[in-house]
């Protein structure tokens, strides 16, 4: 799995949003100006190799599925879908209603046929999942767009969407924890940072007394 990628939102479409820019919406690496960087923030879908790793990590492409070179057209298509899904999800959370052009584009992507799945035997004789007919960009986009449509039209899941409380983190996730008490995208990352920051504040307060 590529460093900085995150697959714990509870929805594939929210995992896609997590590749966008600042930590919690992407990798969070501030570096110079190179390909894949926007305003000094690393884009989690910086190139075809990054997109390939995301597709596998998100479970959209079964392990061992041969993936050819994913060109700039793939990257641009997924970035565009990410932007539109993010626009729609945040509009719903803010209660401002859908942005019609973004909605039309997501609906158009969702209307395409998703890739077919079949069971084949591997070299050990076990049945494994495989995509039938190869991996096509439109099919991959349709899978993510359909997940977004399902989320946007499900009041129950919409009510579970939370934004990470970590400082500088904008990741969105479904809070399915007991009592709906989840505060961070990751207890090990943002949660641990918050605990460390809290400890440092206490130390400074004690030192100042």
PLM regions: where:
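Short helix-coil boundary/hinge micro-motifs
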Residues: 1-163, 170, 207-209
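Residue-level signal for short amphipathic helical patches enriched in basic/charged
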Residues: 155, 176, 191
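Residues immediately within or flanking Cys/His clusters that coordinate Zn2+
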Residues: 161-166, 182, 187, 193
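Short linker/helix segments within small regulatory modules
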Residues: 175-182
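Basic DNA-binding region of bZIP-type proteins
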Residues: 188-206
């Amino acid at each position: 799995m590529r460093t900085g990628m995150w697959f714990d939102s509870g929805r594939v479409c929210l995992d896609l949003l997590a590749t966008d820019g600042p930590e919690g919406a992407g990798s969070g690496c501030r570096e110079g100006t190179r390909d894949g960087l926007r305003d000094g923030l690393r884009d989690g879908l910086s190139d075809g190799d990054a997109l390939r790793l995301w597709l596998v990590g998100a479970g959209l492409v079964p392990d061992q599925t041969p993936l050819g070179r994913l060109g700039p057209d793939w990257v641009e298509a997924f970035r565009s879908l990410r932007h539109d899904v993010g626009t729609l999800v945040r509009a719903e959370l803010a209660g401002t209603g859908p942005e019609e052009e973004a909605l039309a584009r997501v609906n158009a992507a969702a209307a395409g046929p998703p890739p077919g799945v079949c069971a084949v035997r591997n070299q050990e004789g076990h049945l494994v999942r495989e995509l039938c007919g190869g991996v096509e960009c439109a099919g991959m986009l349709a899978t993510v767009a359909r997940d977004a449509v399902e989320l946007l039209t499900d009041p129950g899941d919409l009510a579970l969407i939370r934004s990470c409380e970590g400082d500088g983190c904008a990741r969105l996730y479904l809070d399915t924890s007991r009592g709906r008490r989840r505060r961070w995208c990751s207890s090990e990352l943002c949660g641990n940072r918050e605990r460390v920051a809290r400890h440092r504040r206490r130390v400074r307060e004690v030192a100042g007394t």
